[in-house]
């Protein structure tokens, strides 16, 4: 049984690990994976058709804990302990819930002190006792007790007339004064762990199409002095098609991983693929997982030729590998009486809306099957790749965008060289 410390408006954890409000989803999953022998039977709950309409939940079924992540920014918003019989809880080092101590109204009063009068929810038949960043829900035994809990008669804990021994049914940790109005806080400095995160990514474009990326980056920078004085650093960097490896490294720092392409599975869809001369060396990616961005370099010139932006929607094969990339892409409208106008495509745009702005692709989509090995199937199904305006949109079956690949302009003279090949 887990023995955890409750910190209102902040966290739930122990000496080895801590679930902190504002923590990105990937870090919470990393904690669960590291301690999989202790924390077992974890479920990932999400809406398959409408992933933005409901919170993303990690359900620790064995331990009676639910971690609720904001559907948009994917940071931890609420920590719910839904079954207090499966976990030990303490506050300021003193237990208020264990096998020997029941979490009664008297015990909560002793451990946390007085607070504002509670609120009775007749629909749930639950009584909610609220502290700042912390709420307890008590189960009422019958509807006949409801009049005792009307707010007009509640002037403090002593006047609530909770039946002796009534115990907590649920506990919530959140940011602010109201559970209903709470939002996921900004990522705490303790969660950066030396990484740089992207607050936003703007796609820069010229007259012909995408030209590069402008990234607004966040880092936990600490100047001279103690780590406790660390502050959030916000800065902007730009990278462009044609930039060298050294340019990108100086702008964004070292990638988390370098991946060399062993084959190009999309090559067959290019003009005259059988005429292309096989390369002796392979193109390679810089994978920036916390930025949600991949950068592809040409094997011969070592210059940027593609950017890949990842949305990290649940139900996609690459889910939880990348932090969500909050991108904005200006689109050139292909409509009557809309010459010169632009609209913006974001991480949350749906493919139907993008098609209305850009026009329907001339060619049918390429169906993309992903699996960990040739003999395995992908439980999430295939995705569909559409090409428009030097961009490839990978579309999931629920109409959301899984990734966007941006292509640089063709190199001068490349068509001539291709035509001269035997």
From Swiss-Prot:
Q: Which UniProt keywords apply?
A: Cytoplasm
Instruction: Tell me which Gene Ontology terms the entry assigns under biological process.
Output: Golgi to plasma membrane protein transport
Q: Where in the cell is it found?
A: Cytoplasm; Preautophagosomal structure
On whether Cytoplasm is a keyword of this UniProt record, the answer is: yes
Q: Which domain of life is it from?
A: Eukaryota
Say if the entry is tagged with keyword Cytoplasm: yes
Q: Tell me the Pfam families matching this sequence.
A: PHAF1 (PF03676)
Gene Ontology, cellular component aspect: dendrite; phagophore assembly site; synaptic vesicle membrane; trans-Golgi network
So what does this one do?
Plays a regulatory role in autophagic activity. In complex with BCAS3, associates with the autophagosome formation site during both non-selective and selective autophagy.
Stated family: Belongs to the PHAF1 family.
Q: How does it assemble?
A: Interacts with BCAS3; the interaction is requrired for the association with the phagophore.
| Protein name as catalogued | Phagosome assembly factor 1
The protein's organism comes out as: Homo sapiens (Human)
Per the UniProt record, the lineage of the source organism begins with:
Eukaryota, Metazoa, Chordata, Craniata, Vertebrata
As recorded in Swiss-Prot or TrEMBL, the protein's gene is named PHAF1
């Amino acid at each position: 049984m887990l023995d955890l410390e409750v910190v209102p408006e902040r966290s739930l954890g122990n000496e080895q690990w801590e679930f902190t409000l504002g923590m990105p989803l990937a870090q919470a999953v990393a904690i669960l994976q590291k301690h999989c022998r202790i924390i077992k039977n974890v479920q990932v709950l999400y809406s398959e058709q409408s992933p933005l309409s409901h919170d993303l939940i990690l359900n620790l079924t064995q331990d009676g804990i639910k971690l609720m992540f904001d559907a948009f920014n994917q940071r931890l918003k609420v920590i719910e302990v839904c079954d207090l019989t499966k976990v030990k809880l303490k506050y300021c080092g003193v237990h208020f819930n264990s096998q020997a101590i029941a979490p009664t109204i008297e015990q909560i009063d002793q451990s946390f002190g007085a607070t504002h009068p509670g609120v009775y929810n007749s629909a749930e038949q639950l009584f909610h006792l609220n502290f700042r960043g912390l709420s307890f829900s008590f189960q009422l035994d019958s509807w006949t007790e409801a009049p005792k809990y009307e707010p007009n008669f509640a002037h403090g804990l002593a006047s609530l007339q909770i039946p002796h021994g009534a115990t907590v049914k649920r506990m919530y940790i959140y940011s602010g004064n109201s559970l209903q109005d709470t939002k996921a806080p900004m990522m705490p400095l303790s969660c950066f762990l030396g990484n740089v995160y992207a607050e936003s990514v703007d796609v820069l474009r010229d007259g012909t199409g995408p030209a590069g990326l402008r990234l607004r980056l966040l880092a936990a920078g600490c100047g001279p002095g103690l780590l406790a004085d660390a502050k959030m650093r916000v800065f902007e960097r730009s990278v462009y098609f044609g930039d060298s490896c050294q340019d990108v490294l100086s702008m964004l720092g070292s990638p988390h991983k370098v991946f060399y392409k062993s084959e190009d599975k999309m090559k067959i869809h290019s003009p005259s693929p059988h005429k292309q001369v096989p390369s002796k060396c392979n193109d390679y990616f810089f994978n920036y997982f916390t930025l949600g961005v991949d950068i592809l370099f040409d094997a011969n010139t070592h210059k940027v030729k593609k950017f890949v932006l990842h949305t990290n929607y649940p139900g996609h094969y690459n889910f939880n590998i990348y932090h969500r990339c909050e991108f904005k892409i200006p689109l050139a409208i292909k409509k009557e009486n809309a010459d010169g106008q632009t609209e913006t495509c974001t991480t949350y745009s749906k493919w139907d809306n993008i098609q209305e702005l850009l026009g329907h692709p001339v060619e049918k989509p390429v169906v993309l099957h992903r699996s960990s090995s040739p003999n395995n199937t992908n439980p999430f199904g295939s995705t569909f790749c559409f090409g428009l305006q030097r961009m490839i949109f990978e579309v999931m079956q629920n109409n959301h965008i899984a990734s966007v690949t941006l292509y640089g302009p063709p190199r001068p003279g490349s068509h001539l060289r291709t035509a001269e090949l035997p």
